C-alpha cells in the first residue's frame, strides 16, 4: 500500500497560477499552511508498521518519487487517482493548462509509466508537479496499511490517504 501525507501534491501548479493571478486566496493559504507542517509526526507514526520505503515528495513530484522508490525495489504500483489529496482548485487549474515550468523536465520520467488512464494531460501535470515541502510517500505492507493510516491521521495528518498498492516485481 502507498500512503501520502495531506494535500501536498501540486504546489507548482498553484504557484504558477498565482503568478498569473489565477489562484484563489483559499488555495494559496491552504498550501502555505500545509507547507509549514512538519512531516516529523507522520514519520514517527509510520515506524511501527514496517515501512518498506518512504520519502518526502519534493521537486520530482509524486510520480517521480514513486518511480524512484519502485525502481529501487524492482516492483510496480497502481495508483487510485481519485484518492490523491489535492489542494482546492488544482484539478481545474491543470485542466486549464496551467502547469509549473518544471513539468516538462519532470514529465520525461513518464517513459516509465506503463499506463495512465483518466483526464490524461491534467493528471500527468498533477502527478509530475514539483513540490516544495511536500508530504510523505510511504510504502508499508498491505496488511498494515489501514492501521498505519490511522496512526498518521492521529498524528495530525488528517488528509493522509492510501493512494494505491504495490503490484509486485516488474
Located regions from the model:
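Helix-biased detector of long, well-ordered alpha-helical tracts
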Residues: 1-170
Amino acid at each position: 500500500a502507498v500512503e501520502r501525507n495531506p494535500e501536498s501534491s501540486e504546489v507548482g501548479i498553484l504557484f504558477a497560477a498565482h503568478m498569473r493571478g489565477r489562484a484563489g486566496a483559499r488555495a494559496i493559504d491552504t498550501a502555505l499552511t500545509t507547507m509549514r507542517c512538519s512531516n516529523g509526526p507522520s514519520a514517527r507514526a509510520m515506524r511501527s508498521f514496517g515501512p518498506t520505503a518512504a520519502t518526502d515528495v519534493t521537486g520530482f513530484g509524486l510520480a517521480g518519487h514513486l518511480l524512484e522508490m519502485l525502481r529501487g525495489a524492482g516492483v510496480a504500483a497502481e495508483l487510485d487517482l481519485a484518492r490523491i489529496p489535492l489542494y482546492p482548485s488544482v484539478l481545474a487549474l491543470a485542466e486549464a493548462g496551467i502547469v509549473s515550468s518544471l513539468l516538462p523536465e519532470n514529465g520525461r520520467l513518464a517513459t516509465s509509466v506503463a499506463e495512465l488512464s483518466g483526464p490524461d494531460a491534467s493528471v500527468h501535470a498533477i502527478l509530475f508537479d514539483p513540490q516544495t515541502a511536500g508530504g510523505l510517500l510511504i510504502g508499508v505492507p498491505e496488511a498494515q496499511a489501514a492501521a498505519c493510516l490511522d496512526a498518521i491521521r492521529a498524528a495530525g495528518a488528517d488528509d493522509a490517504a492510501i493512494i494505491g498498492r504495490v503490484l509486485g516485481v516488474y
